[in-house]
């Protein structure tokens, strides 16, 4: 792997131990995956923020870095934490958990990482341009950046994204190379599914769950998804579910995604997969693990856009919920929802607009929640293992109706 003289100095420890460790990690990754050099990045998005997921060992790792007074070299934002950083007491979060979570946040702050704590950084200012090289870690954000925006990133781990942010570079391999962005599977929706389409936004989570299971870590091309006229929130949900059930970090969709005009495929014998009503029905059945009533309704995995919050507020006007409701979003989106009056409507109905976190990385199992209703395919995949929760999966209207 070729290194510049400056990069060699960093690797030799001439600029301190933290930079040496960061460079060593990036060079090691480059060696493993056959990168020939490091390339500059324009931004980073760092996972491994919730104390629930990184525990004491992650906290110590971050505080070791922060005490050396090292700063990130590029614009870097954080993934969700394990709690709302302001109203954690109101949510019932244990004080011991909260104190350690706040130490994690303080460590990132010292390194000048933006404390936006969201899995949708592209909605809050971390918006890469077409073809830009970035180093992002959150799986749903990686999918959106690669696919919808046409930026270039591998699915990084938290430490490698942090190292890239501190060095300002990443190894040149994987999805940074055009030859690794070609279609491996063609997905076609059955004509009957399209002509008799009866689903709401949860359809994209179910479809993503199904395609992720089939394609695994390949690159699907959706031949006729555009006929359903999905919006960016739908594409966000689709990519998140595919990344959760498989390992998909990039997809193409005719007339919808950034690189769709050049339909390059791996070879002439590419597999074509047809998905119809029965397959979607089966996906819904698998994602639903209980018929009982939920004790928590969670919407916002990935974090809600303003339009999603507006829809929830409209559905909850003059209503009262029987179950707890968390509407998860970023600090930025919540500020606008507050101004628009959406937060007040949701709170009047008995719900909460929760920022900085989501149902998957917060300790909801310790708060007594056992059955969670969600419209998110990604959350439906992760909740049983991450939170020991049973899942009710469906459209927002269904989840809020009669509850």
Swiss-Prot record:
Reactions this protein catalyses: (R)-5-phosphomevalonate = (2E)-3-methyl-5-phosphooxypent-2-enoate + H2O
Keyword Iron: yes
EC identifiers of the protein: 4.2.1.182
A UniProt-annotated Pfam family: AcnX
Keywords: 4Fe-4S, Iron, Iron-sulfur, Isoprene biosynthesis, Lyase, Metal-binding
Function, as annotated: Component of a hydro-lyase that catalyzes the dehydration of mevalonate 5-phosphate (MVA5P) to form trans-anhydromevalonate 5-phosphate (tAHMP). Involved in the archaeal mevalonate (MVA) pathway, which provides fundamental precursors for isoprenoid biosynthesis, such as isopentenyl diphosphate (IPP) and dimethylallyl diphosphate (DMAPP).
Species whose genome carries this gene: Methanocaldococcus jannaschii (strain ATCC 43067 / DSM 2661 / JAL-1 / JCM 10045 / NBRC 100440) (Methanococcus jannaschii)
Binding note for cofactor: Binds 1 [4Fe-4S] cluster per subunit.
An annotated GO BP: isoprenoid biosynthetic process
GO molecular function: 4 iron, 4 sulfur cluster binding; lyase activity; metal ion binding
Cofactor(s) recorded in Swiss-Prot or TrEMBL: [4Fe-4S] cluster
Protein name as it appears in the record: Phosphomevalonate dehydratase large subunit
Quaternary context: Heterodimer composed of a large subunit (PMDh-L) and a small subunit (PMDh-S).
Coiled-coil segments on the chain, per record: none
